UniProtKB/Swiss-Prot annotation:
Molecular function (Gene Ontology), one example: acetylglutamate kinase activity
Name of the protein: Acetylglutamate kinase
Family named by the database record: Belongs to the acetylglutamate kinase family. ArgB subfamily.
Pathway: Amino-acid biosynthesis; L-arginine biosynthesis; N(2)-acetyl-L-ornithine from L-glutamate: step 2/4
Origin organism lineage: Bacteria, Bacillati, Bacillota, Clostridia, Eubacteriales
Amino acid sequence: MISPLEKAGILVEALPYIKKFSGKTIVIKYGGHAMLNADLKKAVMTDLVLMKFVGINPVVVHGGGPEITGMLHRLGIESQFVSGLRVTDAPTMEVVEMVLGKLNKEIVALINGLGGRSVGLSGKDANLIMANKKYSNDCQDIGFVGEVTGVNPQLLQTVIQEGYIPVVSPVGISTEGETYNINADTVASAIATALKADKLIILTDVEGILEDRQDKGTLISTVKMEDIPRLIERGVIQGGMIPKVECCMQAIQTGVATTHILDGRVPHSILLEVFTDKGIGTMVVSD
C-alpha cells in the first residue's frame, strides 16, 4: 500500500512534466498485448484521459494484427505473410477494414466511458492518410498493402482543438481511390511528423531494446541514432524491432523531438514514461 506521503511525492514528481508537455502533442501507437488484456486496455485509456485533462494532446494510432488474423481464421481465409507484411487481397482487405473499424470504435467507447472525449477516424476520412501501393523487399506483389505518401494534419488539429482525442485506424487511400492496409507504426510516425509532435511512443510486447534479450537488466534506456546500425549488425536489434526503430528514426529525422519504445504489458506505461524522472523503455534520440 502506498502511503499518503509517497502519493504526494508521485504528484510532485509529475508536476514539472505536466508543465513541460502542456499544450504539446504526443502520438501513441497502441498495439500488442495492451490491446488484448482488459486491465491493460483500461490502464492505457486512463493514461490518455489523464493526459488530456492536464493539457496534453494525445493522438492514438492503433494496430489490430492478432484480431485480423483471428477473424480471417474464423472466415476460413488463410493468413499469409511476406517479409513480415500481411498479403492483402481484396477479400482480406475487406476483413482488415471491418476489424480495424470495430476496434477503433471499441477504443473510442472506452475513452468516453472513462470521462474523456474521443473521435474515431479511418485514414480514409478527409484523405487523412494518403497512400501508394507497397511491394515486399524482394519486389513481390502483396496486394492492398500501402505506404504513406501524405497526411492531412488539419483534420487532426481540428479534432484536437475541439477537445477530443483522435483515434486513427491505419487504413489509407490512394489518389485513385484504392484502400490500403498500412503498418500502424509507419502511420504513427507519419502522423507524429505531420503534427510536429513532441513525442512518438510505440507500445510493444518487450521491455525495449535489450543488449541481451534473455536478461531484462540489460535494457538500453537511451540509444543514439548513430549507434543503431551497429546494434543491428550485432543482432541486438533484430526481427520485428528493426522496423519499429526505423519508424523512430524517421520521425526524429523529420522533426519529432523524442521517440520511445515502451513495454505495453506494464500497466500505465505511458504515464510512467511521460511523468516520471526515470521513465521506462528505450528512448531513441538524435545524434
